């Protein structure tokens, strides 16, 4: 199923999300196609809705190179780990945790095989979904140092927020007994 077909099933109470997704994926000008579709994929995976993720991967396979698709999946995977670890060290009152060695492998951050700024952008989007302020700050700083504008960064965050919200709606609709999710 394509994303458009899946989005058509979103109920009327989430019409704003449908419209936002359409405009963010079809009318935005701040991001390259790779940046946009990598953000959609990484955000879908981070949002943990199987139907949305399946549709996003299917649509993105046409938009991204195999290497780009793999890198977007890698960004979601590594940030799934890092966001928990660094959110803990950031939020814990005991400051010693932040000084202890991480001892977690993160090689994919340097070996993903695509443009570094695109990978950083996807990591920032996933970090926003997962609520890790330390990771958001770290990746946003790299993006700004590499010449990304605030507008480009927030374009990816808009996509992440809408993808996450749509995934939540799909989860809620799936939990309803014998009701179909029609618009």
Regions found by a protein language model. Name each.
Residues 1-183:
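Hydrophobic alpha-helical segments
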């Amino acid at each position: 199923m394509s994303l458009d077909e899946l989005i058509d099933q979103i109920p009327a109470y989430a019409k704003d999300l449908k419209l936002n997704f359409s405009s963010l994926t079809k009318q935005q000008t701040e991001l390259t196609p790779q940046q946009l579709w990598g953000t959609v994929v990484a955000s879908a995976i981070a949002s943990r809705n199987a139907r949305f993720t399946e549709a996003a991967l299917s649509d993105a396979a046409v938009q991204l190179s195999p290497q780009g698709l793999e890198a977007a999946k890698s960004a979601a995977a590594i940030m799934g780990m890092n966001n928990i670890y660094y959110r803990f060290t950031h939020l814990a009152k005991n400051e010693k945790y932040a000084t202890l060695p991480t001892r977690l492998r993160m090689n994919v951050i340097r070996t993903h095989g695509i443009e570094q700024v695109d990978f950083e952008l996807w990591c920032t989007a996933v970090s926003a979904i997962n609520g890790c302020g330390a990771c958001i700050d770290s990746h946003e700083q790299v993006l700004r140092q590499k010449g990304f504008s605030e507008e480009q960064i927030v374009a990816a965050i808009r996509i992440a927020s809408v993808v996450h919200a749509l995934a939540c709606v799909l989860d809620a609709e799936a939990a309803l007994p014998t009701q179909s999710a029609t618009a």
